[in-house]
Amino acid sequence: MSAIVDIIGREVLDSRGNPTVECDVLLESGVMGRAAVPSGASTGSREAIELRDGDKGRYLGKGVLKAVEHINTEISEAIMGLDASEQAFLDRTLIDLDGTENKGRLGANATLAVSMAVAKAAAEEAGLPLYRYFGGSGAMQMPVPMMNIVNGGAHANNSLDIQEFMVMPVGQQSFREALRCGAEIFHALKKIIADKGMSTAVGDEGGFAPNFASNEECLNTILSAIEKAGYRPGEDVLLALDCAASEFYRDGKYHLDGEGLQLSSVDFANYLANLADKFPIVSIEDGMHESDWDGWKVLTEKLGNKVQLVGDDLFVTNTRILKEGIEKGIANSILIKINQIGTLTETFAAIEMAKRAGYTAVISHRSGETEDSTIADIAVGTNAGQIKTGSLSRSDRIAKYNQLLRIEEDLGDIASYPGKSAFYNLR
């Protein structure tokens, strides 16, 4: 039995200089698991609650000492002595202990830190890499990365309303080659932006945030960077967008302030369809407000056969909401963010539900990250096929890519890279 003998929660900093929760779990054998949780900038209203202290005199109210205290007292007492290899039972214990629908009492940042640290300790005890512990012998598919190379919206201080412009290398034979492709495009884009006299400073997720005049100018510049790096847009590399439309939806309209547009749901669906016709866009995330299910239905009917429509704020990694979306034919993919739900067991349940329904699952970081690379292991352990973990700069993003390189090396000849087949539900 891999009995838990000690649990230590602590306050650490994330990549934006804000406090977050880290947890160590020590087992009877002496092995330890350590995990740190991320936090988001643009968040869905139905996400599990990230518990913050609210003391304005300390870290501007963003301290997490209450969540840490919950780990070191109540949670510690509840799971001390439990078998770390019984992940589902342990996570259920955390859920029941919290007793709320949204982890609002203990904090999802507390429950997730413990859930992840326990899994890491159990994997170490079993002598298995974390991805293998999660997925068993069937874990062998590397993910196609969504690489956020231009930031707008809530992630940047510029005139772009769309939050993320991403490249997805799909024409390569391995993750290693896909990563090289993305890095070369990143450097080509930096040179193009610099030559235009624009800023090459990077945003929260490592992408550039230049002041392009329009979304189309941004997309055309990215196409130029792909070609400058020696790759073919539409063949070797596809594009992806994260609209984060909930951020610019007001009074029943989509306000693209950077372009002087106020659009109805139907008009915004047409706007996105026009972009998908003009550019090799294979994926659009949060293309409608999280509560605009009628708009989502229009968008899905218009683009759902040829573009991956990812629900992030829409589904918030929650099986109850995802189930409703599947039944109503809303979107065709879910973004998986572990801190939106607060335990690994619930995260895996959302991935499994999506796959059973023919939806894709994209494993994702948050804008406030740490050096923790667990999501890389989740992506391979669940054979998700896609990962979204930022640009080709900032060590908090690169930590995940480097972990994926190690995993691919560990898998050796059995590692597979899906390329375009990652979008298995598109025609």
Swiss-Prot record:
It holds the Pfam family Enolase_N. CDD domains: enolase. Coiled coil: none annotated. Its EC number is 4.2.1.11. SMART domains: Enolase_C (SM01192), Enolase_N (SM01193). This is Enolase. One of its GO terms (molecular function) is phosphopyruvate hydratase activity. GO terms for cellular component: cell surface; extracellular region; phosphopyruvate hydratase complex. It comes from the Bacteria. Mg(2+) binds at D242, E285, D312. SUPFAM superfamilies: Enolase C-terminal domain-like, Enolase N-terminal domain-like. Catalyzes the reversible conversion of 2-phosphoglycerate (2-PG) into phosphoenolpyruvate (PEP). It is essential for the degradation of carbohydrates via glycolysis. Binds a second Mg(2+) ion via substrate during catalysis. (2R)-2-phosphoglycerate binds at Q163, K337, R366, S367, K388. InterPro entries: Enolase, Enolase-like_C_sf, Enolase-like_N, Enolase_C, Enolase_CS, Enolase_N. The active site is at E205, K337. It comes from Ralstonia nicotianae (strain ATCC BAA-1114 / GMI1000) (Ralstonia solanacearum).
